[in-house]
């Protein structure tokens, strides 16, 4: 049993969660503070959550493919994207970012606005208000978003196989390894990878739930 799909999955989910964390909380804060087109912005950010992952992967191919202007620009800089590990990260970010965004936005909306008003009257900058007041006070919701984001990225399949492919040792994650094993009629290998993915997800979620319960007590 080759272990590269496990490490590729772990690296991809970790990188995607890291990127989605900063993008998600920044977008949540920005959307809450725009007056015009807030509904449109919210819909665009949330859209990948409701679209079939294969559709997301197809549009990623259109945007970053070799024949697209953006894809060609990356190629000119010597940075190919399609069917590389970077593509697995991009696919995971696109499908998991809405979860981070929605939970972070919900956490920010529940905060007492008087705290922010008081900080502003004291002359505290918006940057410090965001990182020193809003994020720490919304930490439980943000951590919940991180858990959802990581587990979503961990099990990503449709967008990944469309945009990054299923290249062993490069883009083959546990999910795509299961698909490849079933296609090869190797159900024993598929079962091993499926069990590993379930167990890893359970351990991660249980550990994060225990940490959240301890931090609230």
Predicted features, each with a name:
Residues 37, 41, 98, 105-116, ...:
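C-terminal transmembrane helix and the adjacent membrane-cytosol boundary/short C-terminal tail
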Residues 27-62, 116:
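Cytoplasmic-entry segments and transmembrane alpha-helices of multi-pass inner-membrane transporters
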Residues 1-4, 163-202, 206:
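Interhelical loop and adjacent transmembrane-helix boundary motif
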Residues 18, 101-104, 108, 112, ...:
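Transmembrane alpha-helices
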Residues 65-66, 142-180:
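Non-cytoplasmic
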């Amino acid at each position: 049993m080759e272990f590269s799909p496990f490490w590729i999955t772990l690296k991809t989910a970790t990188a995607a969660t890291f990127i989605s964390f900063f993008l998600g909380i920044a977008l949540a804060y920005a959307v809450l503070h725009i007056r015009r087109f807030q509904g449109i912005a919210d819909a665009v950010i949330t859209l990948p959550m409701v679209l079939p992952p294969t559709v997301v992967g197809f549009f990623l191919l259109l945007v970053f493919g070799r024949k697209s202007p953006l894809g060609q620009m990356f190629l000119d800089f010597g940075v190919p994207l399609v069917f590389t590990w970077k593509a697995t990260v991009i696919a995971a970010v696109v499908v998991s970012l809405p979860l981070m965004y929605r939970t972070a936005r919900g956490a920010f909306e529940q905060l007492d606005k008087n705290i922010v008003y008081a900080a502003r009257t004291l002359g505290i900058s918006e940057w410090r208000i965001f990182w020193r007041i809003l994020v720490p006070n919304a930490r439980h919701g943000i951590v919940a978003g991180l858990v959802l984001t990581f587990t979503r990225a961990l099990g990503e399949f449709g967008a990944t196989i469309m945009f990054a492919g299923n290249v062993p040792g490069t883009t083959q994650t546990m999910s795509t390894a299961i698909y490849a094993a079933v296609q090869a009629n190797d159900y024993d290998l598929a079962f091993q990878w499926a069990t590993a993915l379930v167990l890893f997800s359970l351990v991660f979620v249980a550990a994060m739930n225990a940490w959240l319960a301890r931090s609230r007590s």
